[in-house]
Amino acid sequence: MTSNERHRLSLIIATLGPSTDNEKELITMLMAGIARQWTEGVDIAGVLHSDGEETAKNRIELFREQSKKRNLSTSIYLDTDGSDMDKYIAFGNEISPEIMSFDISNGLDFFKTIKSKLEDNIKICVRVKLGTSTEGLDDFFRECDYSMIELDSKVIHDEKIVMRSKDNSCEPIYLALMPTLMKGQVQSREENFEIGHTLEEGFDLIALYQETSHGPYAARSVKCIDEISVESEKLRVNPFQDMLDKFFSFFKKK
């Protein structure tokens, strides 16, 4: 599927976990509901190495298997909450994700050398957690292909985080939070507004974490982000066509 054929231009990363170990839920996320009730499904699966190597490998294999079975071109975003970088790097080289994330706390020198330790096809992402100082972020952006932005929406706006990341050829990813969907099927208007408003800063990739990995309504969470993204794109003057064309070309989307 090319970007010209998509109704939603933004790409969605859904983190896999116990909730998506239910194969039916995983398939619903991939296929955008039953018989594609909404526009597009999940583009990229987030997988945590720190959940255990066997667990992570099983989730990746199942996601790739279901994607291939349905002729869907999807990708893997590998992350970890662990501290053993040697094991994490070895696992990444074994399963070859398209994107591999590392926490900013590893330090700038780490990011300057990490590419030489990974397979050539793996793209590097710096994870910027909530509360991280925005000083010196540009140095990290310059070393990476992607940035996972978990900062407060006001900080993202005031500190021009999206522009700074893109100016350094580092594509920013927005971690959307919908805590109400951890309890029920209807997200709050306040959450919708904050996510939509933040996407208008220029994010072209949106990630979900707990909502899809542990939440009771994983597929519903993806559907909500899909709807918010579509509405947000209508308000943007230039819907990032060039970036998407490059992205789809890199991952060989059809």
For each predicted feature, which ranges?
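Non-catalytic helical/linker scaffolds that mediate oligomerization, partner binding
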Residues: M1-K254
